[in-house]
Amino acid sequence: VRIEKRYNDEIGELTDTINYMAGEIATTEQMKNEFISSVSHELRTPLTAIKGWAETLMLDGGNSPDTMNKGVKVIVTETERLQQMVEELLDFSRMQNGHFTLQSATMDILAELGDAVLIYSEKAKRETKEIIYDEPEMLPFVFGDKNRIRQVFINVIDNAVKYSSAGDRVTIKAYESGENVVVSVRDTGVGIKQSDLAKVKTKFYKANHTRRGSGIGLAVADEIISMHGGSLSIDSEGEGLGTTVTISLPAQEKN
């Protein structure tokens, strides 16, 4: 619904503002609908795989060790995917309701980053992708929730691997910059259109609809980093030119 603009004075400006707000509401509603459709699809896909392989194993999996191993591997992988998605949805709900809290303490950011890199190193290798991480010997400690920070690293590295193709590289760096500890994750994957860059951290938004994902992971990650007094930025030169995610957190003051 749009209001016809009849004047070029204050009334006209008000008309423009109302029309703009109406457009934003319509866009948000469309994004929510797309989000619900996307999540339904994302839940259905692993459930279908789990059900299919469970039925296969019940029928004749015991007669073939290869079939058994393959089926169990698929079930475990898809179950982990479901678990990650449910956790993202729960976190998103808590943030919306103001019930999301941090359990902060002095933490070693390299330990959490190292765990996240380890989780995806083998996955990347299986997909003929390369993760390059030259871990520094030491960085200042950070005051934060180590589980939530690790969650952010996992989300960002997962995206970098997911939106890359065979032969692509994911380069991870951690360093001190002024009073901050910085982690950058750069991939040589599909990249992001300039018109999408400002929207990728928006709730429900998916820049690439051909890859799996709920569209809320980055919104949750961005909120977690903001709650730590830090920043999460996303840069890309364009489609096919890769993406760089930079996470900056305030270093804990040395006594």
Identify the function of each model-found stretch.
Residues 167-179:
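Short beta-strand/loop element within the Bergerat-fold HATPase_c
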Residues 192-204:
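Short conserved segment of the HATPase_c
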Residues 4-6, 103-108, 125, 130-140:
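Conserved catalytic submotifs in the C-terminal HATPase_c
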Residues 74-82:
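Short alpha-helical segment of the dimerization/phosphotransfer core of two-component systems
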Residues 97-102, 141-144:
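Conserved micro-motifs of the catalytic ATP-binding
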Residues 1-20:
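HAMP signal relay modules and closely related sensory coiled-coil linkers
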Residues 229-230, 234:
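Conserved glycine-rich
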